[in-house]
């Protein structure tokens, strides 16, 4: 398993590098890329945002392993994950209103503080302290995926008066470097935890200086901005009306809830499936992120002028790949007949599918959901998404360890078949909808929501 992990990592990294180099040679420079003021503004944003992302990714490979290291049972670990998911959905519902009320810069600084506290709780072996840490992690995640983007968009348009058409360029570049940071973070986590031998808590301690630096740079370099608050009840009511009045929105929300709930369960299960076979968790995680980056690169190539595939086609392909991968996992995790290499390949295919799924979903969501109602509609998407994931983890918590993992993958397979049926329904509804087609080469940003 050790050799397989390193070979896969090197191979995926080489593939990604080759695709990105060919894309960069073929892509003409844009006007925004040569504007010195815009580049300075981008740099001020990236310095803080990339530090925050790096700190987040650094913790991912060893979270489950840390709880195992503290001798918690799988059911207890499942409850910790459920607590994190529940806090994410609760804080996510009010994150936009909270950010508007506190101010975007203040919210980014608050993120640095709460996430640092979350990391500090990992030093404790007390179960209640770890539950509090998971709740803080949920708040931090909600702030990470709302405050930073809101601050940038307001500053870009209102303070600097740059063209709104340049905003996607910033987030497309951020999406690429987010993947790169995730790959590097996995290797760094492996280095401090395993190579140096500091143990599974080391990546969490290493994340704290990055978070402190991100908060300090935001305080020093960023201006504050606020926005007019819209009542939370009005936001949700408007989102519900949009959801019920447009079948496309309802089907898209169903696909998102089913697909991403399965991905949340995958995040929980990959460590207990591979770790008993001596897998280097940091390198495994970096391989996952490289596979996702490869999928994102393939999305850009597929939607280019040369191939001109549509996001709807790639969304269908992503769901099909995950269905196939989950069927593989139901066999590779059979008690007494485990095949870790086959499971690893299936996990890589799931991550590749994520690289196709997220930019496709992002494109379709922006086209289908009115901009004024996106926050409200997304709130309604999050509730079933996280509820399904929590339910799945609780089912695993109550099952026998030897058969529970395989049963969970079987359930996930059934869920993804339902998602595939929803994709077929959406495809039937939108097949003649020109609005959902890419008319020219596009560079859709990938914004990971897990």
Curated annotation (Swiss-Prot):
GO biological process, any: molybdate ion transport
SUPFAM superfamilies per the UniProt record, alphabetical: MFS general substrate transporter
The organism's place on the tree of life at top rank: Eukaryota
Tissue-specific expression: Expressed ubiquitously but at relatively higher levels in the olfactory bulb and the skeletal muscle.
Chain segments annotated as transmembrane: 1-21, 43-63, 79-99, 128-148, 174-194, 195-215, 249-269, 278-298, 311-331, 344-364, 376-396, 409-429
Alphabetical list of CDD domains matching this protein: MFS_MFSD5_like (cd17487)
Gene Ontology MF annotations: molybdate ion transmembrane transporter activity
GO CC list: membrane; plasma membrane
Predominant subcellular localization, coarse grouping: membrane
Record's subcellular location: Cell membrane
Membrane topology designation: Multi-pass membrane protein
UniProt-listed PANTHER family: MOLYBDATE-ANION TRANSPORTER, SAM (S-ADENOSYL METHIONINE) TRANSPORTER
Role summary: Mediates high-affinity intracellular uptake of the rare oligo-element molybdenum.
Family: Belongs to the major facilitator superfamily.
Protein name: Molybdate-anion transporter
UniProt source species: Homo sapiens (Human)
Gene, per the UniProt record: MFSD5
């Amino acid at each position: 398993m050790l050799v397989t992990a390193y070979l896969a990592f090197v191979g995926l990294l080489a593939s990604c590098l080759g695709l990105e180099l060919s894309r960069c040679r073929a892509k003409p420079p844009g006007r925004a890329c040569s504007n010195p003021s815009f580049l300075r503004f981008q740099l001020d944003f990236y310095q803080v945002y990339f530090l925050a992302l790096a700190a987040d990714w650094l913790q991912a490979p060893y979270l489950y392993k840390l709880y195992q290291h503290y001798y918690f049972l799988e059911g207890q670990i499942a409850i910790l994950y459920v607590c994190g998911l529940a806090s994410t959905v609760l804080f996510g519902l009010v994150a936009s209103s909270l950010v508007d009320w506190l101010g975007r810069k203040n919210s980014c600084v608050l993120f640095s503080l709460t996430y640092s506290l979350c990391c500090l709780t990992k030093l404790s072996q007390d179960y209640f302290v770890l539950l509090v840490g998971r709740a803080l992690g949920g708040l931090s995640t909600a702030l990470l995926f709302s405050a930073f983007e809101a601050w940038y968009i307001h500053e870009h348009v209102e303070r600097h008066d740059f063209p709104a058409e340049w905003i996607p360029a910033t987030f497309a570049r951020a999406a690429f470097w987010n993947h790169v940071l995730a790959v590097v973070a996995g290797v760094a986590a492996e280095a401090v935890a395993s190579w140096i031998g500091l143990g599974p808590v080391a990546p969490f301690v290493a994340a704290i200086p990055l978070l402190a630096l991100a908060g300090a740079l935001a305080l020093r370099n960023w201006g504050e901005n606020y926005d007019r608050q819209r009542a939370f009840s009005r936001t949700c009511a408007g989102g519900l009306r949009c959801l019920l009045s447009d079948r496309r929105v309802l089907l898209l929300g169903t696909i998102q809830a089913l697909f991403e709930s399965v991905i949340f369960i995958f995040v929980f299960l990959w460590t207990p499936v591979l770790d008993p076979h001596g897998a280097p968790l940091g390198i495994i995680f970096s391989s996952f992120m490289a596979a996702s980056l490869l999928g994102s690169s393939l999305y850009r190539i597929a939607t280019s002028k040369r191939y001109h595939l549509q996001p709807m086609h790639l969304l269908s392909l992503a769901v099909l790949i995950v269905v196939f991968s989950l069927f593989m996992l139901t066999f590779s995790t059979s008690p007494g007949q485990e095949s870790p290499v086959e499971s690893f390949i299936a996990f890589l295919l799931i991550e590749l599918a994520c690289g196709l799924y997220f930019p496709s979903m992002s494109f379709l969501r922006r086209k289908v959901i009115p901009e004024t109602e996106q926050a409200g509609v997304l709130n309604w998407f999050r509730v079933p998404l996280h509820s399904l994931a929590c339910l799945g983890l609780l089912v695993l918590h109550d099952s026998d360890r030897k058969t529970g993992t395989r049963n969970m993958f079987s359930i996930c397979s059934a869920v993804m078949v339902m998602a595939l049926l929803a994709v077929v329904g959406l495809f039937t509804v939108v097949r003649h909808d020109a609005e959902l087609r890419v008319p020219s080469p596009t560079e859709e940003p990938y914004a990971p929501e897990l």
